[in-house]
Every structure is written in C-alpha cells, then in structure tokens.
Amino acid sequence: MNDRRLLLVHAHPDDETIVTGATMARYAAEGAHITLVTCTLGEEGEVIPPELAHLASDREGGLGEYRVTELERACAALGVHDQRFLGGKGRYRDSGMMGAPTNSHPACFWQADVDTAAHELAAIIREVRPQVIVTYDDNGGYGHPDHIQAHRVTMRAFAQAADPSLPGTPWQARKLYAIAQPRKLLEESVARMQADPGPFTAPTAVEDIAPGTPDDLVTTRIDGSAYWEKKRDALQAHATQVAVAGTRFALSNGIAQEIHAVEYFTLLHGPEPRRGPDGYETDLFA
C-alpha cells in the first residue's frame, strides 16, 4: 500500500465497473487506496436473467439488496476493499430513468437535498483524504438523474470538504475528474459492434450507447489493459444488469458494447495536465 488515495462517486452498483473498472483495478493493484462511494442500491434497474425477474421493483422487489451482493463481488474482482453507500445503505433510492414516475419518490436521490448529500460525502472525503476524486460530468454521462445528481453532490462536497469555515479538519483534494467517453472512439467502437455484435443487437448509432464526450474536452487516458480480465469478471458479477459474452457486454436493452480496459477522463479541477505525445495525461495522480 502506498500513500495514493483515489475516491470515486458512482450512482448505482455496476456503474463503477462499466466506466471505471479497469482504472480501479489498476490503481488497486499498484497499491493505491481505492474508496468507492455508491449513491443508491439500484432498485429500479431492469433485470436481465429470467430466473431473477421477480426481484424487479414492479414485481416482488428485493433488487436493491441483491445488487449490494453483486457489488461486493465486483469490488472483490477489482481489488477494491473500501466501498460505502452515501449516507449509509438505503439512504437514497434509485430514481429511475429521466421522466419516470419514480423521479418523484420522496426518498429517491434525484429529490435529495444537494447540500445535505454533499455534507455526507464531504465527511467521507475528509476522512479518506483522497488526492484524486472521480465522478460524472454535468450531464451524468447520458442524462440519468442519479448520475446528474452525483455530479452536483460531488462538486458541492469537493468545495465543502476544503472549506475551513465548516466544522472539522478541511481537506483539499488535488484533482477532480469527470468520466469521459471520447466521441471518436465511441464511433469506432460502434462500427466494430455493427460488424460483429456477437450474441447481442448491433447499435445503430453512438447514441445507442452514450452521447460521447467531445474529443477536445478529454484530458486523460488510463491504460488498464493488464486488468481487462478483472473488469470482465466484475461485469459478470453484476449479472442482474449486465450480460457478458467474450469481449462484449450488453445491458438490459441488449445492445452490444465493447469491454474497454482503456478509460478516459476530463480534468475539472487541478493543475494543468501533463500530456504525453498522444495528447493525453496518463496518470490520475500526476
């Protein structure tokens, strides 16, 4: 273990693996302390395996607790030993997709008071004292209300944790990143999936996967290729939400996506990135 500390804020179980799994596995293997803060239990997820369909929120329920177990297995696969739920397990409920009636549930994360949730996260930041914090961009990557709220809460907590006027010992993280999915690379990936989607449905456009990040906004490239299998294993742990086949996976919509072990980020706060010849910074702690 070294003195590097990385804290990631994600909305639901499985988000951590899909977009940052290789990064987490790499830094964990290199001895960094990884703290994963998950904001909800993912109660509104659609269930893929027919034998587990009864867990869905519109049937018997129980999906949230089941996904806690999946998250534990995924973290074990990635080598992550410090996973927490914001405000405690079950404090905030999955809000569902934007526009769903569940957006109005009084306990859902979308309805949470941002200052209150940020205070809870700031307390974790002050305890862990990470040099680097990672979350979503202001659109939450693809517009999910819980992802957007995670961004808002993290931005507020980043400031609160460093504020000496608030009770407790302040902590200023050196860097804050948003997860990025470069548009050009998504286009190339979609073309490969259109040519060979495996057992899944081929995407018709980039938007079937995510809007993508404008390429000029992407600052950082983390090569986790050596940890591709760990990411795949973690994806397989999230079996209610993710189907895995070879180098591909699909969510409940059945659309083929590649399992990427090279992951990208946009620096939101911190010193100017030390970019290499390819134009990217290659270490979150640089």
UniProtKB/Swiss-Prot annotation:
What is the disulfide pattern of this chain? none
Q: Residue span of the signal peptide, if any?
A: none
Q: Which GO terms describe its molecular function?
A: N-acetylglucosaminylinositol deacetylase activity; zinc ion binding
Q: Which UniProt keywords apply?
A: Hydrolase, Metal-binding, Zinc
Provide the binding site for Zn(2+): H12, D15, H147
Q: Which reaction does it catalyse?
A: 1D-myo-inositol 2-acetamido-2-deoxy-alpha-D-glucopyranoside + H2O = 1D-myo-inositol 2-amino-2-deoxy-alpha-D-glucopyranoside + acetate
Q: Cofactors per UniProt?
A: Zn(2+)
The EC number(s) attached to this protein equal: 3.5.1.103
Say which enzyme class the record assigns: hydrolase
Hydrolase found in the keyword field: yes
- Residues folding into a coiled coil are none
Recorded superkingdom: Bacteria
Q: How is the cofactor bound?
A: Binds 1 zinc ion per subunit.
Q: Name one GO biological process term.
A: mycothiol biosynthetic process
Q: Cross-referenced NCBIfam families, in alphabetical order?
A: mycothiol_MshB (TIGR03445)
Q: Which PANTHER family match?
A: 1D-MYO-INOSITOL 2-ACETAMIDO-2-DEOXY-ALPHA-D-GLUCOPYRANOSIDE DEACETYLASE, N-ACETYLGLUCOSAMINYL-PHOSPHATIDYLINOSITOL DE-N-ACETYLASE-RELATED
Q: Which family does it belong to?
A: Belongs to the MshB deacetylase family.
User: What is its biological role?
Assistant: Catalyzes the deacetylation of 1D-myo-inositol 2-acetamido-2-deoxy-alpha-D-glucopyranoside (GlcNAc-Ins) in the mycothiol biosynthesis pathway.
* UniProt name for this protein: 1D-myo-inositol 2-acetamido-2-deoxy-alpha-D-glucopyranoside deacetylase
